[in-house]
Regions:
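Single, function-defining residue in the core of a domain
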Residues: 1-8, 12-26, 30-172
Length: 172
């Protein structure tokens, strides 16, 4: 079991910690929803222990704390859309790391190639679409998009009773 767990991806996420009461309002930040702090954590599921963490004001965006993670070659990282930064994603790929996240709905991508469901290990019942995609915009806001032209993989899976989940999975 330990060997199998060693192949699990690292998990990167944050959670707000609400702090209310006399004395807290003077020094804790308010993000419109929570007054308190935010814990950013990188977990290793193989050990069940945090690998890295930081505690910030509740107003700090998740992507601003991505620096707590030093990518390892061959490692896989899973994180949510709060860590959307195409240039950071390019750095992960350059370091030889992989990642899985959800693409934002406004991500400007084009499909390069469709993969037939018969190419999957399963019967295709849970995988609705498997595609290689490429970012089409050279600029991301006011800065260059270092993911432009790189091939990424987008997989859409079914979830009974819920909307399909679209995952973007990028390798090196």
């Amino acid at each position: 079991m330990r060997k199998q767990a060693g192949d699990l991806p690292y998990l990167l996420d944050s959670t707000p910690i609400a702090l209310k009461g006399r004395g807290f309002d003077q020094w804790t930040g308010h993000n419109g929803r929570i007054t308190g702090l935010k814990l950013h954590i990188l977990m290793n599921p193989a050990t069940g222990c945090p690998v890295a963490h930081s505690i910030t004001d509740a107003r700090v965006n998740d992507v601003d704390e991505r620096h707590i993670m030093q990518p390892e070659k061959g490692a896989t990282y899973v994180f949510d859309k709060g860590y959307c930064d195409y240039n950071w994603w390019a750095k992960l790929g350059e370091a030889g790391a992989y990642f899985v996240t959800r693409l934002k709905t406004n991500a400007a991508v084009e499909v390069v190639r469709h993969i037939k469901p018969t190419e999957h290990e399963n019967t295709g019942e849970t995988v609705l679409a498997d595609e290689y995609i490429r970012f089409t915009h050279r600029q991301n806001s006011s800065r260059p998009n270092r993911c432009h032209g790189k091939i990424l993989r987008r997989i859409t899976v079914s979830r009974p009773g819920r909307e399909p989940l679209v995952l973007g999975c990028v390798g090196n």
